[in-house]
């Protein structure tokens, strides 16, 4: 999205860069593209993060520390391992609350806030929002009974909540902004904190000092269209896999050629090729949920 803004809205992009430098606009997500989290290979996922972080460093002089995927249709057991090995500390989504049926006991997700353990035993913090698509009314959130009840479910007495316009894009609605502002000034039983997407994770580092955090060791699955989208548009998935294999072969050949003093490693060419098809690993593209 930032690359598109850079190309088509250069004036607004420069204004945004100024806000980032002033600490008024915060980056999140770490990746080049808001990827699907099940079809792409591990190599694709790691390169997606690498390219995203390179872009953040080059354009803004900062890096992201989290995986931010509010709208994907399930999350594989490898994701905490990949994120941890990329130096990331947390992951958030809200999509699992859109499930039709409970899957983790009586709940649609294992917990609201805790640790998610990957296949190699490494862990990141998992924060799951609730009530997919919910918007706040123009009221004092510090008095919100639902927030109070949800926070009470966790050992940290905390709830993580997105706010904004959602699928149709754009900034938070005026009513949502006013509700947060009233909550920040409010004196109710709920303390409202306006924070970046990764602040929660940073506040509880190192995680080993918080044995009260629940641990989930497994996949985060999605029903509704989250099942069919991994079999639909099979040709697109075939081309994606062919691109991944070609990217791996090109990397090996290029490195070997440089080792043998036969050619200079074409780093920018390889990166641009990966960007072109990682762009199509977007969670509403590769999954076949868009035209």
Where are the regions that the model predicts?
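Catalytic-domain carbohydrate-binding cleft regions of carbohydrate-active enzymes
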Residues: 1, 5-291
């Amino acid at each position: 999205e930032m690359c598109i803004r850079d190309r088509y809205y250069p004036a607004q992009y420069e204004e945004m860069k100024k806000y980032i430098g002033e600490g008024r606009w915060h980056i999140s997500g770490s990746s080049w593209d808001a990827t699907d989290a099940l079809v792409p290979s591990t190599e694709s996922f790691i390169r997606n993060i690498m390219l995203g972080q390179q872009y953040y460093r080059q354009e803004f002089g900062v890096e992201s520390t989290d995986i931010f995927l509010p709208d994907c249709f399930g999350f594989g057991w490898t994701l905490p391992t990949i994120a941890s090995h990329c130096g990331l500390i947390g992951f958030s989504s809200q999509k699992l609350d859109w499930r039709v049926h409970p899957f983790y006991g009586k709940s649609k997700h294992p917990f609201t806030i805790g640790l998610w353990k990957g296949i190699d035993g490494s862990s990141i913090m998992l924060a799951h929002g609730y009530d997919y698509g919910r918007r706040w009314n123009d009221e004092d959130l510090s008095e919100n009974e639902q927030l109070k009840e949800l926070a009470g479910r966790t050992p940290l007495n905390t709830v993580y909540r997105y706010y904004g316009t959602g699928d149709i894009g754009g900034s938070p609605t005026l009513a949502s902004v006013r509700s947060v502002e009233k909550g920040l000034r409010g004196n109710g039983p709920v303390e409202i904190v306006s924070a970046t997407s990764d602040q929660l994770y940073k506040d509880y580092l190192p995680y080993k000092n918080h044995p009260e955090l629940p641990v989930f060791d497994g996949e985060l699955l999605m029903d509704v269209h989250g099942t069919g989208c991994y079999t639909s548009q099979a040709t697109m998935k075939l081309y994606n896999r062919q691109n991944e294999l070609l990217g791996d072969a090109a990397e090996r050949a290029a490195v070997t050629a440089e080792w043998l003093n036969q050619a200079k490693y074409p780093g920018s060419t390889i990166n641009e090729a990966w960007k072109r098809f990682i762009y199509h690993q977007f969670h509403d593209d590769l999954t076949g949920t868009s035209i």
